[in-house]
Amino acid sequence: MPSASCDTLLDDIEDIVSQEDSKPQDRHFVRKDVVPKVRRRNTQKYLQEEENSPPSDSTIPGIQKIWIRTWGCSHNNSDGEYMAGQLAAYGYKITENASDADLWLLNSCTVKNPAEDHFRNSIKKAQEENKKIVLAGCVPQAQPRQDYLKGLSIIGVQQIDRVVEVVEETIKGHSVRLLGQKKDNGRRLGGARLDLPKIRKNPLIEIISINTGCLNACTYCKTKHARGNLASYPIDELVDRAKQSFQEGVCEIWLTSEDTGAYGRDIGTNLPTLLWKLVEVIPEGAMLRLGMTNPPYILEHLEEMAKILNHPRVYAFLHIPVQSASDSVLMEMKREYCVADFKRVVDFLKEKVPGITIATDIICGFPGETDQDFQETVKLVEEYKFPSLFINQFYPRPGTPAAKMEQVPAQVKKQRTKDLSRVFHSYSPYDHKIGERQQVLVTEESFDSKFYVAHNQFYEQVLVPKNPAFMGKMVEVDIYESGKHFMKGQPVSDAKVYTPSISKPLAKGEVSGLTKDFRNGLGNQLSSGSHTSAASQCDSASSRMVLPMPRLHQDCALRMSVGLALLGLLFAFFVKVYN
């Protein structure tokens, strides 16, 4: 996957409600009409006023349907899964039907202009259809003051554990913004807790963000404005998340971040140390895939990384963006490495990890790129014949240094993108593998629904027949055909389908991270189509699990206090009346 999405605006941080207003969940319980009326009133006049008053627009949050759309990288997708899980755990129904939804949660990507254009168009469409809207992701985090975001609720990339509160207030008609950073004693944290409820898009694949932000300051990157500087999760929290995932039937874990290679530098550890700890808890038959890493940081750990990538439960795959094969262009990008560094990493890993798949990214038409610069990039692709290559035409992102540089003409950028794409499609990376027998892990269905999609040890895509017995299993296949991006494999007739030593996966759309009792109750509730109020859900849920709302138990205690206070008032009132 390309690293497609990856700042703080202190004066835009707003609390969900003001101090004078009651907390969102309190409003379900503190109702003005339960306060005793001591003074007599003219009943006829009162009824007439009631008849002439405008109709009530009262809305009880926690029973609406929500449609979630996510653009961008695997980190963004993980955030979207977490938000879906929390909303479902609270009682909202997550729907795949946008027109049927009461609220749209749009989780954006700021890497390229087209992604933001799609995001903006979706906002416009939601407004035309009178949908409630909550915005998330890197676009509103990086530029919350854009005109087309005015009046809309925003949840920041580090505040996704409060999505229920933001949605709740938005449904009530309020516009709220939460853009703060998670900190502990002044130290920036990786983000929301990893043990929050989640709905995995694919129940077999767990995406774990090991850190957020990065250590670089690339001149073209808008993601830095949203995700900020490096902040890593502790190793024990990541290992616990992996263990929980395997207990829920996951058979493949993706480690993601804006730069996995920089992991741990802010907390006194490093990527190899984390990977060795994770390898210890991966069940046989399950696999680990490492996400994008920039050349400067992996250079320090080449020996250890080679050993890890040779491990049978780790895909021999690494995504290392080069962006350009011209040192002068890399300098203008502030990439903090030269082409020789990139080649050293790739050459070393190819030697020490036979068959490894190296994926890379290239930007065509960066400001100042000459024809000679571009030809150097073409030569690099011709030399290494990358089986996975993400070619991106340069788009100047607002507020970045590169946007202020002298731009390459649009037509030149387009032509260079086409030329490099032609080079990429001139070779066939998998033809020589026809006839091989491979072990593949089956994890999903193809887009055309004709095959199941599996991956071999090198994370190369292998299409296999749609046999339900294969899903989530290790299957032995003979490769009989290849294309530009895939191979096709025929299962060996006498080979045993290997079942990983893990639990049965959750059903599609099922919430992870919940206790068994709570999950069963939630499933019964959603399947019957009946929804209790947010208040009753809080009462039932709090006895079984800790929901991802920091005020939950405080609210329950507050409700009890309010109830007792009201009883006291009623008692005092009747004592006074009858005395």
Curated annotation (Swiss-Prot):
Its main location: endoplasmic reticulum. The chain crosses the membrane at residues 556-578. InterPro entries: Elp3/MiaA/NifB-like_rSAM, Methylthiotransferase, Methylthiotransferase_CS, Methylthiotransferase_N, Methylthiotransferase_N_sf, MiaB-like_arc_euk, rSAM, rSAM_horseshoe. Residues 431-493 form the TRAM domain. GO terms for biological process: maintenance of translational fidelity; tRNA methylthiolation. It is an enzyme of class 2 (transferase). GO terms for cellular component: endoplasmic reticulum; endoplasmic reticulum membrane; membrane; rough endoplasmic reticulum. Its cofactor is [4Fe-4S] cluster. The modification Phosphoserine is found at S53, S122. Residues 200-431 form the Radical SAM core domain. Gene3D superfamilies: Methylthiotransferase, N-terminal domain (3.40.50.12160), tm_1862 like domain (3.80.30.20). It comes from the Eukaryota. Pfam families: Radical_SAM, TRAM, UPF0004. Binds 2 [4Fe-4S] clusters. One cluster is coordinated with 3 cysteines and an exchangeable S-adenosyl-L-methionine. The modification Phosphothreonine is found at T499. Keywords: 4Fe-4S, Diabetes mellitus, Endoplasmic reticulum, Iron, Iron-sulfur, Membrane, Metal-binding, Phosphoprotein, S-adenosyl-L-methionine, Transferase, Transmembrane, Transmembrane helix, tRNA processing. Its EC number is 2.8.4.5. It is found in: Endoplasmic reticulum membrane. The keyword Thylakoid does not apply. GO terms for molecular function: 4 iron, 4 sulfur cluster binding; metal ion binding; N6-threonylcarbomyladenosine methylthiotransferase activity; tRNA (N(6)-L-threonylcarbamoyladenosine(37)-C(2))-methylthiotransferase. [4Fe-4S] cluster 2 binds at C214, C218, C221. [4Fe-4S] cluster 1 binds at C73, C109, C138. It is a single-pass membrane protein. PANTHER family: RADICAL SAM PROTEINS, THREONYLCARBAMOYLADENOSINE TRNA METHYLTHIOTRANSFERASE. Catalyzes the methylthiolation of N6-threonylcarbamoyladenosine (t(6)A), leading to the formation of 2-methylthio-N6-threonylcarbamoyladenosine (ms(2)t(6)A) at position 37 in tRNAs that read codons beginning with adenine. This is Threonylcarbamoyladenosine tRNA methylthiotransferase. It comes from Homo sapiens.
